């Protein structure tokens, strides 16, 4: 017995050390090979708690991974889907999803997490758009959100004929400004390194044109409008799909990456009660507001009031744990995963960028106010000793003879991806939040069970179907769709038991948090019976009894 206990302790230490080694050895954001190695190590170290599956391969042959975490009957345990990397340039979201999985499993030897994983499943999609994200590691850096599928963005029947060019030779694609009296742009007064559009209503006048760095290769008057690839996966989902918009694809759900997650969630993950996206949308730092007009239309475009209340509750928990209440609100964009998860998948959908530029203090310790978020970022970056800006440099440009053309601007990626040194602490707090969210899950229990003799060989059976969770068993919008399974209450009789009154099967659309409903049946005879209640996204509770 002592040897068995010792072996168990050693195993816990090995697993924990392995996870800590993964975290401490990592010194920079993970490219696809690093990400795959870390996932395989989790699969090897925690084989009884995880399974690693490739949903498909991208155009460049990269796997679209999903890591399932949990124990026992995982398909019938309420689940949280955690998604990173839908926006290709937001590499922090991908890193956050992966590091969450590592930190959660590193805690699996604690009572809190061990018990959680016995009743809750996590589906982690660490990098939904790996081909786009991989460009972060390319020699020539530019913010890329699209995959590598060739597209004809300018509809001229030529593909990828007008890409970016590195005009100043720094291996970064930034911005280009051209001095011209007819321009619509001017220097920002708050920080003259930055450019802003002139506001004619305020009497402002522009004196620059602003483009992304490059040349007009196809001579159509537009710059870099048809570069390499592709489709932005975070604009390719089915809700509010932006037809004909650059990067959205030829049609909704047209991409391997999009279909991979849609097929998995619809076909294999009916137990999901919430989707958490690490991306640009943000309804966690600031919850959404109820808009009665948006829910009164034939096509609903806003959250129901009951669901907004849930959003506020979860947001309060998020801010208490992460202290990110200062992060800007963002209700999402057309065709994104965040909105799809609520409006078309019918689940509670939460999203956060996971990081935002903190408050900037002056020399006296007072918070500085900024009109421009970019100006705020540059002051903060300088305080951190970051090299975040390419100074404007004059270049010769064949498309603008006799004009002053300069290249410069904020470096790619740095304004919305934190320094890697911040990842560990941010992942720690977001792991705490996801554990908290999982603990709020709907949880159907059969309670207050009673049998009572009713005379003449009759027995009255009564039970309360109770949702002991904080969240309702379904979002209000989920009640309107066919994609969220309703709670099923079922009575099964055996022996010579005969049902006199009541229904052997009932469906319940939703039970609010800490809510209950009572069900009674009248049966004749004796024998055994089974009562079960629940759904994959609420857990299933069962009572077995015999009437003699």
Language-model segment annotations:
Residues 23-27:
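Boundary at the C-terminal end of the N-terminal hydrophobic targeting segment
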Residues 465-480:
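Short amphipathic, basic-aromatic surface patches that mediate peripheral association
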Residues 9-21:
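Bacterial N-terminal signal peptides
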Residues 497-526:
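Intrinsically disordered, low-complexity Pro/Gly/Ser/Thr-rich segments with frequent PxxP/GP/PP motifs
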Residues 76-79, 91-92, 99-299:
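Active-site/substrate-binding loop(s) of hydrolase catalytic cores
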């Amino acid at each position: 017995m002592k040897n068995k206990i010792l072996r168990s302790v050693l195993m816990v230490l090995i697993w924990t050390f392995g996870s800590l080694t993964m975290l401490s050895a990592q010194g920079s954001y993970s490219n696809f090979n690093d990400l795959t190695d870390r996932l395989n190590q989790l699969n090897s170290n925690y084989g009884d708690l995880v399974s690693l599956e490739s949903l498909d391969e991208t155009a460049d042959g990269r796997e679209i991974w999903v890591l399932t975490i949990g124990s026992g009957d995982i398909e019938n345990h309420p689940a949280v889907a955690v998604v990173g990397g839908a926006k290709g340039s937001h590499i922090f979201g991908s890193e956050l999803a992966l590091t969450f999985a590592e930190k959660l499993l590193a805690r699996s030897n604690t009572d809190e997490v061990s018990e959680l994983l016995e009743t809750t499943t996590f589906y982690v999609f660490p990098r939904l758009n790996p081909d786009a994200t991989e460009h972060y590691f390319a020699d020539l850096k530019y913010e890329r959100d699209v995959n590598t599928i060739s597209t004809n963005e300018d509809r001229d029947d030529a593909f990828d004929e007008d890409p970016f060019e590195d005009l100043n030779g720094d291996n970064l694609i930034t911005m280009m400004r051209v001095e011209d009296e007819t321009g619509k742009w001017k220097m920002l007064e708050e920080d003259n390194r930055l450019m802003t559009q002139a506001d004619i209503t305020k009497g402002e006048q522009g004196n620059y044109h602003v483009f992304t760095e490059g040349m007009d290769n196809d001579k159509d008057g537009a710059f870099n409008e048809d570069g390499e690839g592709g489709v932005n996966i975070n604009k390719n989902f089915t809700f509010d799909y932006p037809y004909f918009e650059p990067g959205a694809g030829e049609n909704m759900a047209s991409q391997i990456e999009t279909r991979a997650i849609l097929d998995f969630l619809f076909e294999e993950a009916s137990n999901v009660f919430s989707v958490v996206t690490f991306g640009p949308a943000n309804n966690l730092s600031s919850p959404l507001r109820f808009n009665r007009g948006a829910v009164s239309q034939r096509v609903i475009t806003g959250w129901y009031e009951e669901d907004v209340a849930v959003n506020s509750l979860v947001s309060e928990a998020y801010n208490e744990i992460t202290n990110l209440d200062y992060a800007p609100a963002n209700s999402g964009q057309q065709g994104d995963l965040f909105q799809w998860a609520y409006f078309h998948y019918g689940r509670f959908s939460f999203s956060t960028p996971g990081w935002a530029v903190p408050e900037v203090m002056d020399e006296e310790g007072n918070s500085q106010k900024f009109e421009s978020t970019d100006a705020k970022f540059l002051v903060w970056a300088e305080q951190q000793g970051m090299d975040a800006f390419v100074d404007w440099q004059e270049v010769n440009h064949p498309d603008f003879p006799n004009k002053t053309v300069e290249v410069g601007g904020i470096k790619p990626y740095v304004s919305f991806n934190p320094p890697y040194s911040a990842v560990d602490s941010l992942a720690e707090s977001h792991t705490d939040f996801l554990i908290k969210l999982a603990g709020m899950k709907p949880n159907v229990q059969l309670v207050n069970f009673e049998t009572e003799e009713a005379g003449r060989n009759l027995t009255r059976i009564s039970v309360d179907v109770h949702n002991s969770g904080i969240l309702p068993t379904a979002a209000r919008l989920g009640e309107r769709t066919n994609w969220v399974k309703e709670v099923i209450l079922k009575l099964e009789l055996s022996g010579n038991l005969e049902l006199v009154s009541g229904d052997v099967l009932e469906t319940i659309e939703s039970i609010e948090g800490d809510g209950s409903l009572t069900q009674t049946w009248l049966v004749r005879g004796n024998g055994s019976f089974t009562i079960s209640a629940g759904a994959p996204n609420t857990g299933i509770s069962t009572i077995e009894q015999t009437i003699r």
